[in-house]
């Protein structure tokens, strides 16, 4: 399994829909079944991700989220901001506005 963390709003769901990756999103109430050979894009940072992606600026990224997602995350106080800071400080993320198919292909090449 390849597991890639992307911050909310970076294009994870679009890539999953277009290329058939597993979309493991904490915003959705039901979780997908994950198989051994899947490529999983998630917005939950865990120790075992193969790569981490963050936007350059938390506030701008948060403001780009839909109003529903902003409301959802505001109910959890600083959860998303704390998550952003954790990934930034602990995991040496790739900083860019959006994740692309090319990024995923590069990760797959590195994993062999």
Placement of each model-derived feature along the sequence:
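Glycine-rich phosphate-binding P-loop
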Residues: 1-19
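Ordered hydrophobic segments in well-structured contexts
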Residues: 3-9, 40-42, 52-53
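Conserved substrate/cofactor phosphate-moiety recognition/catalytic segment
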Residues: 17-48
């Amino acid at each position: 399994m390849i597991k890639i963390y992307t911050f909310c709003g970076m294009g994870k769901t679009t890539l999953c829909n277009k290329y058939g990756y597993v979309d493991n999103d904490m915003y959705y109430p039901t979780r997908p079944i994950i198989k051994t050979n899947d490529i999983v894009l998630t917005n939950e940072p865990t120790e075992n991700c193969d790569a981490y992606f963050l936007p350059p600026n938390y506030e701008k990224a948060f403001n780009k989220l839909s109003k529903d997602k902003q409301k959802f995350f505001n109910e959890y106080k600083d959860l998303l901001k704390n998550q952003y800071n954790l990934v930034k400080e602990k995991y040496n993320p790739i900083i860019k506005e959006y994740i692309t198919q090319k990024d995923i292909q590069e990760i797959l090449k590195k994993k062999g």
